[in-house]
UniProtKB/Swiss-Prot annotation:
It comes from the Bacteria. InterPro entries: Fe_traffick_prot_YggX, Fe_traffick_prot_YggX_sf. One of its GO terms (cellular component) is cytosol. Keywords: Iron. It comes from Neisseria meningitidis serogroup B (strain ATCC BAA-335 / MC58). Could be a mediator in iron transactions between iron acquisition and iron-requiring processes, such as synthesis and/or repair of Fe-S clusters in biosynthetic enzymes. SUPFAM superfamilies: YggX-like. Pfam families: Iron_traffic. NCBIfam families: PRK05408.1. One of its GO terms (molecular function) is iron ion binding. Belongs to the Fe(2+)-trafficking protein family. This is Probable Fe(2+)-trafficking protein.
Amino acid sequence: MARMVFCVKLNKEAEGMKFPPLPNELGKRIFENVSQEAWAAWTRHQTMLINENRLSLADPRAREYLAQQMEQYFFGDGADAVQGYVPQ
């Protein structure tokens, strides 16, 4: 049976992830409080942030920015909006 969590992003009980997405405290916090569905939505948003801002994951500042955005997306007021993106 799937592991269930109360997802802080979706504000409902949903299927949790199979393992922590990051090997740190933020990863543990996400594992305990974020559903697979919300994580998938974050990865799509993260991809748009990387592409629109032309981020290089080899750059430590870009990785730090994405970590901050991830924390804001799940536990804060939301991540930065992607410039030029118009939802359909």
